């Protein structure tokens, strides 16, 4: 190019881009190390985290979305165990979402009972129960990272 006949500007820009690529790669590696360490103990790629507050089902969805997560929806036994570990630590129950095509369920004996409510909660053992959507339960959000 006429304003940069020797390509110095282009070379400088290429060096800057390469530096950002290295920094991004390092950041991604660090993030994945933390994620793997957090999920190591539970054997689940999904993280279940509480802010130690309580709330109803409607409020939970918004809280989880704002935090970058979602309402828990364990799809495998190890995910349900990781979720139950949080509940056991805090000795509280929490809401979860059961998908229509769920291959995994963990209903307590005699459940689900629509008469008990249209939402689902997990107890400290990870067993699922029908419940009212207005109950104030422990706020737990699910975070699932795909890189």
Swiss-Prot record:
Glycosylated. GO terms for molecular function: carbohydrate binding; phospholipase A2 inhibitor activity. It is found in: Secreted. InterPro entries: C-type_lectin-like (IPR001304), C-type_lectin-like/link_sf (IPR016186), C-type_lectin_CS (IPR018378), CTDL_fold (IPR016187). GO terms for cellular component: extracellular region. Homotrimer; non-covalently linked. Expressed by the liver. Belongs to the alpha-type phospholipase A2 inhibitor family. Pfam families: Lectin_C (PF00059). Residues 62-143 form the C-type lectin domain. Glycans are attached at residue 103. Inhibits the enzymatic activity of the acidic phospholipase A2 (PLA2). The keyword Ligase does not apply. This is Phospholipase A2 inhibitor subunit A. Keywords: Disulfide bond, Glycoprotein, Lectin, Phospholipase A2 inhibitor, Secreted. Disulfide bonds join 64-141, 119-133.
């Amino acid at each position: 190019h006429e304003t940069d006949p020797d390509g110095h500007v282009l070379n400088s820009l290429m060096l800057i881009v390469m530096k950002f690529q290295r920094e991004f790669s390092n950041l991604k590696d660090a993030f994945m190390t933390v994620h793997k360490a957090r999920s190591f103990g539970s054997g689940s790629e999904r993280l279940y985290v509480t802010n130690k507050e309580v709330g109803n089902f409607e409020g939970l969805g918004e809280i989880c979305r704002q935090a970058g997560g979602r309402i828990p929806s364990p799809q495998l036994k190890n995910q349900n165990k990781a979720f139950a570990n949080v509940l056991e630590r805090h000795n509280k129950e929490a809401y979860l979402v059961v998908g229509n095509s769920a291959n995994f369920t963990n209903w307590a004996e005699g459940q689900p009972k629509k008469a008990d409510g249209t939402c689902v909660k997990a107890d400290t053992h990870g067993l699922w129960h029908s419940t009212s959507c207005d109950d104030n339960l422990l706020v737990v959000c699910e975070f699932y990272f795909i890189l």
